[in-house]
Each structure stands twice: as structure tokens, then as C-alpha cells.
Swiss-Prot record:
EC number(s) per entry: 2.4.2.29
Domain of life: Bacteria
Organism, as annotated: Cupriavidus metallidurans (strain ATCC 43123 / DSM 2839 / NBRC 102507 / CH34)
GO aspect biological process, one term: tRNA-guanine transglycosylation
Name by which UniProt lists this protein: Queuine tRNA-ribosyltransferase
Lineage: Bacteria, Pseudomonadati, Pseudomonadota, Betaproteobacteria, Burkholderiales
Similarity section: Belongs to the queuine tRNA-ribosyltransferase family.
Cofactor note: Binds 1 zinc ion per subunit.
GO cellular-component term (any): cytosol
Sections of the chain in a coiled coil: none
């Protein structure tokens, strides 16, 4: 089940509400990434406390470990991981195609060597839909080929991007057919591909629109292309997605990327950046980024961000976070992750309010000014 309400707009920025089988998601929203069914360093209780409304799981990795038999004994991923709110799962395609020479692509699907034990495995649109049905994810993603930015060390050509995109379209039809055959009560999103070429993106979107997915994602960005190319494609595709369906930008990105995405009509985002950077001591604030390992923070009694309401900023100094990071304490990674995810979710809350009050462009200007100012 998916019901999408477009509550208001401000330019191309959209304020919406997505109702799914496990709850309601207010958009624009950021989805923390829980690759193996766990958002690294965070408990479900902590995710609830910072305002997470939906998380992302990884079909490919959960299929390999713990395996569908384990998840099935819990009647799905929600009970297995102790999370009662919505979950989106990707199709597994991106991970398979990231295996490089370890995989072989045919029209039927992808044969590859398991990165866990070397076993020969096969993944297709049908199998991806079956896995995601067992996981019982609220939002299922079609199986697609993520067109790489580079092939053999050079940008993909128009012909290469076209072949990849058209196979993804054929796989979209097979994904839709299998999703319907399984009588999956959840939602299925199609993924717009086409590389860096606007005409191919248009062809992809036209084909996907005929299949009437519950929502539409922009794939194949933040895969190594220059930032200006990413923004050019985003600016072209975002406003062209069906207005009455939710829009999802996959795997992107920085706080600046999120604000730009919302400006171009995106409703949903995911990225490992806030959690991965947190574990590496790279912290986001409204006034720029803090590299907590730097000696400048050794004796700094201030919080990361005096305007931040997260548990970390309310209770701990930069000096303490610096100390934890330098000695490799687990608590450091946890406190850093709490802060970074809170910052991302607070940024989305602020954008929702700005759109409701029809002052998104003013918010966008102030956001850029604050981030450029840097921490002091």
C-alpha cells in the first residue's frame, strides 16, 4: 500500500506525505542506511529519538547474510531488526554490478560469485522481487542496471548508456509483473536511468510511466561523475517525474545535495555519508564541517553546534569527542553518528517547514551562507 499526498509546493520544492503499511512518512525525508538490517552504531530506539521515519535495507547483503530463511522465521525484516516503522529495500542491482569482473550480465539477469564464500549465484528481476517480498519491505525497488559513469576508464558513450537503460526498462516490466504475481501488498518504485544523457533519461521515464509504479527514483547519479553533470541531470529529471507520485534520489549525498534535490522536486533521499563520515570523525553542522580529529579541538569546551538539539551536542564538548576519536572508543562513533543523522533529519524538518511557509528559496540562501561561513 502507498498513498501519496502532495500537501503544498514552493517552486519545484514539494511538501508531501507518504502513507505505507508500517506508517506515515513526512516528506522531504532522509532515510538512514541500514545495509545489514542495522544502521551502524545506532539502535532502533535511538533512531526513533532522533526522528527517523523510514530506513533503508540492502536486499543483496540480507539475502547473503543472514539469509531469507532466518528473516522468514520472523515474518519479515521489521520484527527481525526490531523496527516497526517503514523500510525501503534496494533491489540488489547496484551491489551486483559493483562486483566488476566477478559478475556476468545477460538479458535474464546477473550471475556472480558470492563475496561471502565464492558460491555461484544468480539474481534476476523475478528473484529480486521474491527476496523483497520475503523481507516485506514497505517500498520495493525494481531490479535495474546502474549505468556506470565510466567504462574502461572513460565516460560511458550514448550507445552504452542507451543499451543499459533499455535493459533496465525491460527488467522494470519483469519486476512489475513479478511484483503483481506475488500479490505484494507493499509499494514498488521504478528507477530512471540513462547516464548523463537527457534524451535517454526522458526515454527511461516515459517507459517507466507506462508501467504505473507507485513511485519513481532517479538512479545512476553520484557514481563518479562531476558534480556539474549530476546537477544538470537532476535539474532535468526531477521536475519531470510524475507529480502525483513520490520522487526518490538514490544514494545522494551531502547536505548541499539534499537541498538542491528538494529544489528540483525530490521527496526522498538516502546515503551512507552521515554514518560513514561520523565513524571517520567528519561531522556536519549548519556552519560547515568539523574534522574532530584535528588538534584544534583538543581543549575546545564548546559543543559541535550550539544550535543543535541532539543528545551529543546537549551533553558533550568537542574536546571529549576529539578524545574519544583519538583513542578509538566505540562511544565516539556512536555520539558522532547520533549527531550527523540528527543534523540530516533536522535539515529535512527545516525544509518541510520552509516549503509549508513558502520561503524555501530564502531558506536555501541562508543555508548556503551558513555552511560557507564555516565553524569558528
Amino acid at each position: 500500500m502507498l498513498n501519496f499526498e502532495l500537501l503544498t509546493t514552493d517552486g519545484n520544492a514539494r511538501r508531501g506525505r507518504v502513507t505505507l503499511n508500517h506508517g506515515v512518512v513526512e516528506t522531504p525525508i532522509f532515510m538512514p542506511v541500514g545495509t545489514y538490517g542495522s544502521v551502524k552504531a545506532m539502535s532502533p530506539l535511538e533512531l526513533n529519538e532522533i526522528g527517523a521515519q523510514i530506513i533503508l535495507g540492502n536486499t543483496f547483503h540480507l539475502w547473503l547474510r543472514p539469509g531469507l530463511d532466518v528473516v522468514d522465521t520472523h515474518a519479515g525484516l521489521h520484527k527481525f531488526i526490531g523496527w516497526d516503522k517503514p523500510i525501503l529495500t534496494d533491489s540488489g542491482g547496484f551491489q551486483v554490478f559493483s562486483l566488476g569482473e566477478l559478475r556476468k550480465i545477460t538479458e535474464e539477469g546477473v550471475t556472480f560469485a558470492s563475496p561471502v564464500n565464492g558460491d555461484k549465484l544468480f539474481l534476476s528481476p523475478e528473484i529480486s522481487m521474491q527476496i523483497q517480498r520475503t523481507l516485506n519491505s514497505d517500498i520495493v525497488m525494481q531490479f535495474d542496471e546502474c549505468t556506470p559513469y565510466e567504462i574502461d576508464g572513460r565516460p560511458a558513450t550514448h550507445d552504452e548508456a542507451a543499451r543499459s537503460m533499455r535493459m533496465s526498462l525491460r527488467w522494470a516490466k519483469r519486476s512489475r509483473d513479478e511484483f503483481d504475481h506475488l500479490a505484494n501488498p507493499n509499494a514498488l518504485f521504478g528507477i530512471v536511468q540513462g547516464g548523463m544523457f537527457e534524451d535517454l533519461r526522458d526515454e527511461s521515464l516515459a517507459g517507466l510511466s507506462e508501467l504505473d509504479f507507485h513511485g519513481y527514483a532517479i538512479g545512476g547519479l553520484s557514481v563518479g561523475e562531476p558534480k556539474e553533470d549530476m546537477m544538470r541531470v537532476l535539474e532535468h529529471v526531477g521536475p519531470r517525474l510524475p507529480a502525483h507520485k513520490p520522487h526518490y534520489l538514490m544514494g545522494v549525498g551531502t547536505p548541499e545535495d539534499l537541498v538542491a534535490g528538494v529544489a528540483h522536486g525530490v521527496d526522498m533521499f538516502d546515503c551512507v555519508m552521515p554514518t560513514r563520515n561520523a565513524r571517520n570523525g567528519w561531522l556536519f553542522t549548519r556552519f560547515g564541517d568539523v574534522k574532530i580529529r584535528n588538534a584544534a579541538h583538543r581543549n575546545d569546551p564548546r559543543p559541535l553546534d550550539e544550535q543543535c538539539g541532539c543528545y551529543t551536542c546537549r551533553n558533550f564538548s568537542r574536546a571529549y569527542l576529539h578524545h574519544l576519536h583519538r583513542v578509538g572508543e566505540i562511544l565516539g562513533a556512536r555520539l558522532n553518528t547520533i549527531h550527523n543523522l540528527y543534523y540530516y533529519l533536522e535539515l529535512m524538518r527545516e525544509m518541510r517547514t520552509a516549503i509549508e511557509e513558502h520561503r524555501f528559496e530564502a531558506f536555501r540562501r541562508q543555508f548556503a551562507e551558513n555552511r560557507a561561513r564555516g565553524t569558528r
